[in-house]
């Protein structure tokens, strides 16, 4: 039996490995592949750490110069998994690097003394967790966040369908996971109906809101000043990564309707689209700007980068 097939001795401190290969918790949310999942993983890890559980978040290194370990918060570390090539790797390319990533995962695991549980996020991370779990006996739970079959059922115009290889990979993760954590009842239902997940192994954990950060107060004035917006303007916003299926064009079309119906509002309204391009929608920002110009509301619609 190889070293990889031997379950490590349990670490003296309760320790969980969280895996999110295709995006880093250190990246700015709202750009590229960094989005809501990043926030979800970070905040969940901090909460577990506050309960006495050490959490190591594993992500694929995008440069050989990145440190092996970065402390994100007390009890939470980011660990970089090194695999070549570093650059020019899309989400769909990650499975081809899996042998290298798994090997480097074992290097980290040996360093810390092992994990009691692996929690993987997104399907490519689930492939790594499935392999490590099968070789060591460490249980793994998985959160998909999105799935190929659901995305392909509701593609926006111009969006590229998710490949069959992703659906097959997701099916294998569903079968192997000790448990699957869904964010909503509808997501749980889709895993059962589309992926034949065992209902007894699917759990719904509804995401919450950090009320210490998001609360009623006097932050509106500060936010307007930060974004360079007139304090007296009526503000309409789209906040998120710029992808067709998120519907940023809906805001632009709605603003055009409002301006046509009530021209007097033109000088009183700003519509803000805040976010960066992501996924297959790399040309989406230019399309949105052209749409605003074509509808005659480019003076009302403003595009801003993500704000931390």
Named regions from a protein language model:
Residues 230-246, 252-255, 272:
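Conserved donor-binding/catalytic core segment of Leloir-type glycosyltransferases
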Residues 16-17, 133-153, 163, 181:
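Active-site proximal beta-strand in glycosyltransferases
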